[in-house]
Structures are given as C-alpha cells and as structure tokens.
C-alpha cells in the first residue's frame, strides 16, 4: 500500500522508471561507465554486466506468481528499482576492481567468462520452466539474447587477440613473379641441354632413313613442317581476339600500324647498321695508322756448293747489286730501290737460321763449323756481319743403340729419320742510316781442311728475319684487335649520341601524342 501511495503521489517518478525499465539492452551498455585505461576488452565487461542484470531479472521472474506481456505492477517496479540500484553499485565496484587489477592474467578472465556462461545457462532453465507464464515474443527474445551472449563468451574464451600486420600483396606478387621467372629459366636451360643431346641422334637417324627410304622421309618431313606451321599459326591467332576480326576497319588499322612499325624498325636498323659500319671503317683506319707491323721474312736457303764456302742470298728489298760488290755502275733498278727503306731505322733484327743435318759419320767427325751472315746494301757493300759456330749434338754409342732399339719400327717404316735440326739465333744488328737491301749467308770452311772440305752435309736450311719494335709500338701491335674493338665501339657510341642530339628525326620517328592535355588541346608539337 505504501508503494502504491508513493507511486500515485509521484507520477513523474513512475513514468521515468517505466521508461528506464522498458529501454533496450543497448541503453544499459551506453550508460555504463567504462574506463579507457583498462586492459580488459569492453565486450567482456559488457557481457559480465549484462549477465548480472539477467540474473536479477530471472530471480524476479521466479518470485512473482504471474506475469503479463503488457506491463508490470507498481510493486514489481519498485523491486526493479532496488535491483537497478544494486546493479549500479556493482558497476561502480567492477570499475574499481578493473582499475586495480591490471596485472591479472587472462586465465582469470576466462574463468569469469565460464561463470557467466553457467549463469546464463541457469537463465535458460528458468525461462524454460516458466514458459507457460511468459509471452512467446518475450521468450523468443530472451532466448536469443542468451544464446548470442553464450556464443560471444565462447568466442572470446577460445580466442586470444592477435595483432598481425596485413601482408603486402605487391611484395608477394613481385616475389612470386621472380620465382616463376627463375623456374622458367631453369626449365628452358634443361630443355635446351636435352635438345642438344637428342638432336645429333635424331639427325643421324633421319639421314639414314633418307638414304634407305627417301620418299617416306620426305613425306615425314612435310608432315612435320605442316604441323609446326599449324601450331605457330594457332598460337598467333589464339592471342588475337576473334571478335575484333569482325570489324574490318579496325583490322585494317591494326595491319597498317603493324606495317608502319615494321617499316620504321627496318629504317632504324639500317641507320644503326650504317653507323656501325662507318665506326668499324674509321677504327680500322686508325689502327692501321698507329700500329706498325714488324718486318718478317721467311726464306728457304739454297747454298752454292761450287764455292769453297757455300753461300746463299735472302733479299730484303733487292739483291741486284750483290755481284758488283761496289765496282759496277748503278743500274736503273738500283736507283729505284736506293731510297727505299724496308726495315725502319733504329730497329733490331732477330735472325733465326735452321739447318737439318744427317747424323752421318762425316758430320760427326767434322765437329765444329761456322756460319756467317752479311748485311749488304743496295750496291753490294757489306754493312755488318754476324758469325756463330755450331756442331751436332753429341750422343754416346750406348745411348745411340738404346734409342735405335726403341725406334726400330719407325726407322724401318720411314716415319723417323736419323737427323738433327740445328737452330741458330743471330742477334745484335741494329738498322742504321744505310738501309739493308740483302742478306748473305755463308758456311765457312774449316782452316785445317783442304779447299772444298770441312763443310757439313745439309738436308735443307731456312732463314727467318723479324724486326723488333719499340716497347709501346710492340704493345699496340700485340693488342691491335682489342684496340680495334674498343675504338670502333667508342666511335659508334659517339656517332649514335651525335645523331640523337643533332639529327634526332633521322633515327627516331615523330609520333603523335595519344592523350591531349588541356594546356595543349590541339595536340600540336612544340
């Protein structure tokens, strides 16, 4: 009675309580004070408070004898006011506990969540027991709320918040592209090596087939070529969109663009080829001017054994005046070659004389003999002379017998002969003011022998003359090919840069812009 009198005396308070109790759940969540510095999630706090409020409502439903879906009595409202006051007190205490328990682990939170779930299960039992007294709409809404809360508690109890950065799709795509490119390169190398190994047997087999059965081989080759051409054509037309083939104008424009592009490609190739050829020609001319070729002469010697000391001549420019020995008049040929210098001045001459002698008893008994080389001028005068003694290499009789035993088969068959080759190196001559026109090689006679004796027996002889270049000229001559490549490439790059800077339209065609900017609406080149 007192509560009824109070509600009648204070109608505004009763209306406020009605609005407060009839408000949805979100209203209670928004009214609850939540501290921002709490380490616990806000969803956990909201579930705890909603579960506590549901416990109060379920205990109310058990104590009341009857319920109506239309509303509540004044006594029920006063009891809910008391429960609401208790709820606010619990909220304040929970905030205080929350601010003081920052060091508590998540395990305690999970235990509390399990308690909340069990309490929510009790709510479901209470609602099921009083199903005859509760409105169907209210029952459905209550069960839905509890089930959703249980699902939220289970989700939170089984999951831990993880902070992961989203993967960068661009980096992953680039990495995948690089990996695929490496795999394709390896596949190409393996297939290429396999083709190199299988191609020779395949070619040999086809050659044998063509030799034994040419007509079937020709038919097989024709089918193979037709299959390859068909595969290439299918690949080309597969890349083309078949719907574009229906538009004749668009196809003609594509063909025209392709032809125009091929024309400009051929034109640019011709220009670049011309620049390359010109650079190669200029590089060759420069190398020919700066690189001096050393003088080289190789001649076979024919000694004149009619003389007491056999002699032979090797012409450098001419040996026309060697018979005069400075006593005969100058001929027209001598006057022509007098001012001709073949070997550059102040260059050394390296002479190598090779003689092949038989291992005869005469040569072994002869022992030492001497070779002389005279440098003659145009009129036959001797400019300089070089002498070198030589002899056969000595081998004792036991060594000779052992070598003959091991070489008996080649000696009998004629693959090996009993000969020795002597190589004499004659150095020390430097070209002076008077140019050298001829060389005279003389085998000098031994002093203790009578005339015509004391001369070795020869199979053949040859002479090699080479002039020595200075140090830097020698380096240029040895590296002339490398210098030619570097000079030609440098000239080509220089010509290309000059053409791009000064004659740009000759090598790069002028193209029209596809998109016209607002500042240049007419598309006119500036």
UniProtKB/Swiss-Prot annotation:
GO terms for cellular component: endoplasmic reticulum; endoplasmic reticulum membrane. It is found in: Endoplasmic reticulum membrane. Keywords: Endoplasmic reticulum, Lipid metabolism, Membrane, Transmembrane, Transmembrane helix. This is Seipin-2. Expressed in seeds, seedlings, leaves, stems and roots. Not detected in flowers. Belongs to the seipin family. Involved in lipid metabolism and lipid droplet (LD) morphology, number, and size. Supports the formation of small-sized LDs and modulates triacylglycerol accumulation. Induces probably a reorganization of the endoplasmic reticulum into LD-forming domains. InterPro entries: Seipin. One of its GO terms (biological process) is lipid droplet formation. Residues 33-77 are annotated as: Disordered. Residues 58-70 have a biased composition (Low complexity). It comes from Arabidopsis thaliana (Mouse-ear cress). The chain crosses the membrane at residues 195-215, 224-243, 258-278, 483-503. Its main location: endoplasmic reticulum. The lineage of its organism: Eukaryota, Viridiplantae, Streptophyta, Embryophyta, Tracheophyta.
